[in-house]
Amino acid sequence: MTQQTMSFQAEVKQLLHLMIHSLYSNKEIFLRELVSNASDAADKLRFEALENNALYESDPNLRIRLSFDKAARTLTIDDNGIGMSRDEAIANLGTIARSGTKEFFSKLSGDQQKDAALIGQFGVGFYSGFIVADKITVETRRAGLPASEGVRWESAGEGDFSVDTIERAARGTTITLHLREGEDELLSSYRLKSIVQKYSDHVALPILMKKEEWDQEKGEMVEKDEDETVNQASALWTRAKSDVTEEQYKQFYQHVAHDHQDPLAWTHNRVEGRSEYTQLLFVPSHAPFDLWNRDYRGGLKLYVKRVFIMDDAEQLLPQYLRFIKGVVDSSDLPLNVSREILQESRDVKAIREGVTKRALSMLEELANAEDDAGKEKYKTFWSAFGQVLKEGVGEDHANRERVAKLLRFASTHGDTDAQDVALADYVARMKPEQTKIYYVTADTWQAAKNSPHLEVFRKKGVEVLLLTDRVDEWMLSFLHEFDGKPLASVARGDLDLGALNDDEKKAQEETGEAMKPVVDKMKETLGGKVKDVRVTFRLTDSPSCLVADDNDMSGYLQRMLKAAGQNAPSFQPILEINPEHPLVKALKADGADFGDWCHLLFDQALLAEGGALEDPASFVKRTNALLLSRAA
């Protein structure tokens, strides 16, 4: 096929501009990204060769080679991995996957460190070569294709690129960077080695360079015809913990998670017994951009006897721990394991149980830290992944108690929206006569904090948890108690805050009896809007509030389901009125404006709990009429 010149996808042009102009001060990341791509190409070859050993083409020793030519001012990264066909070269080097494009650009902050971190995360690392090169030449051939189907891809990083078919004997990919003026420091063995050891020491593939020795006569380093490996070239997780430094763990995390930030915590151990495997797990310090996408692929990298099998093996972790990154290397699974086999395998179930327990132990260590730095780390973790972890209450029955201990909530104990109250903290502060853990759900912290349902709790000094995450109502349908104490909504059913003395009981009964004509007339007036109307003593400042019956769906959950486009049963609340409030005291069952007052008390209560009025115009008209009659 003859040479073709093609235009870059518009987003790639934008990306190239960013690479060249915005990330210059962090330019050495280009080598990290290109080495990482070469390592992935080797992993893919190993995986495909499990089915077809001929793909090795008599060259089974996988490696990455770095070389440079001072005269030509070029730097070359060469691998003997899977390689690319012509179509793959056009697809991989000319476009960015559409799904990630918009998110990538929306995440760019202008902070060079943070923006550099996004490059690997979004799979656009190849283009980082243009930070230091004004032209890139890629020669490649896919394993299994004939030598006549080699490909040359070339671009100056402007608007287009050319693709040509060439003869290429060796499989794999050779990337040649034609360096920009001022980048001569990269034409140095010492400089390249230092970048490799900084970013890519953990890569399990040997990274080779020609040895150099000092030539006394020439007074300079001279290249020898002998290779040396410039990285450790062993799978980091196979080493003893004592042989791995903190810095090496951090670098490995950045490689495996495509993240430029350090992890919050990690755990590394070998498990022997029913199943034998090594696990190296990390807790990231921030959530990936697509964590909530329906097609988000969480999971760990799976290896069998150090052979890479798959990325994102989600069967090794429950969904609520999908943010955990890392590696599992099994000694028992077959090398030809597929995603289907993973679903059925007894060994995988044992690994999943073990990995889940280990991940929860890691989170427990973070949560129980006594020092300020440790506490700060758990706060960081909770703000990034707290809502995901809450899913575990419903998804993981076996570990529900452990997950519940890790949960954090805002509460009336503090005057901030910080979610830093553990259920154990709440229980420790409970009043001697208190038997339940009380909570309120709302759309926002402000709405929860100012809910009329909290008035009597404030008066009696009883703490209430303020729940404002979308997942909370769903979670509460599984979390019925903690430490033997039932969880109770302040907006559901009858309220019991402890025994009343005889005088109080008698006074309340008399008030209820006196209000009966008003209550009955209100029920009749409001009709199908309410399930019931009753006198309450839970309010101190507000005239009315809405509560759900014990077995009914709350108004908050109904609104959430509707917002998600799901069918929700109609909400028929109970209207509770405060007999001590002046507005309620002034109600006359036979008054001409009784109907307007009834609807106003209902609408006010609905608004106070975050609901939406069915007919705002009537509400305004009714309110104006009542204000005018009072003013007159």
Swiss-Prot record:
Keyword Metal-binding: no
GO molecular function: ATP binding; ATP hydrolysis activity; ATP-dependent protein folding chaperone; unfolded protein binding
Residue segments, region A: 1-339
InterPro entries: HATPase_C_sf, Heat_shock_protein_90_CS, HSP90_C, Hsp90_fam, Hsp90_N, Ribosomal_Su5_D2-typ_SF
UniProt region (B), positions on chain: 340-559
Keywords: ATP-binding, Chaperone, Cytoplasm, Nucleotide-binding, Stress response
Annotated localization: Cytoplasm
Family: Belongs to the heat shock protein 90 family.
NCBIfam families: PRK05218.1
Subunit structure: Homodimer.
Function: Molecular chaperone. Has ATPase activity.
Protein name: Chaperone protein HtpG
Source organism: Burkholderia thailandensis (strain ATCC 700388 / DSM 13276 / CCUG 48851 / CIP 106301 / E264)
